[in-house]
From Swiss-Prot:
Protein's UniProt name: Small ribosomal subunit protein uS19
CC annotations in GO: cytoplasm; small ribosomal subunit
Molecular function (Gene Ontology), one example: rRNA binding
Role played: Protein S19 forms a complex with S13 that binds strongly to the 16S ribosomal RNA.
Keywords: Ribonucleoprotein, Ribosomal protein, RNA-binding, rRNA-binding
Classification via NCBIfam families: rpsS_bact
Length: 93
């Protein structure tokens, strides 16, 4: 169920402060964050975030198409190595 429109998008307070500081200083350094749950706002376009995926920080450059999505959507947490090979077919060869 989506978030109520009257509440507005959720963005962590500490992340808002970092974004405002970066925009006011026109600072283009990477903003490190653990806040995967924060929604991407229009003010964040053009900034680069280092989003934590549980193991390391993934760099995410924000574009206009990302506005309205969550930061965590762009830093995958699971690694897919492929399905296990069929042992029977390998043994016959």
């Amino acid at each position: 169920m989506p978030r109520s429109l009257k509440k507005g998008p959720f963005i962590d307070d500490h992340l808002i402060k970092k974004v405002e500081l970066a925009v006011s200083n026109s600072d283009r350094r990477v903003i490190k964050t653990w806040s995967r749950r924060s929604t991407i706002a229009p003010e964040m376009v053009g900034l680069t975030f280092a989003v934590h995926n549980g193991k390391k920080f993934i760099p995410v450059f924000v574009t206009e198409n990302m506005v309205g999505h969550k930061l965590g959507e762009f830093a995958p947490t699971r690694t897919f190595y492929g399905h296990a090979a069929d042992k029977k077919s390998k043994a016959k060869k």
